[in-house]
């Protein structure tokens, strides 16, 4: 489990590997079930798409990371989730993903 600072660093490092250059090209969210949310509901291609997720210390930490990237212009919304919502995920928005 990681701190907000560690997760922000990991996501920023992974963003540098993307060919996209704007935060608005990405979606940030939090969940308690990465497979369901990222690969199911958002329809992200697990094998060929750009995505990352990290496990936060707790829900409050996950929310701090989410709000950080939303303030930079990523797509997504705050709110929702349960106490076990500790996963922060980010993916590149494409014509096949569902926001």
Set out the residue ranges of the language-model regions.
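GIY-YIG nuclease catalytic motif and its immediate N-terminal context
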Residues: 1-99
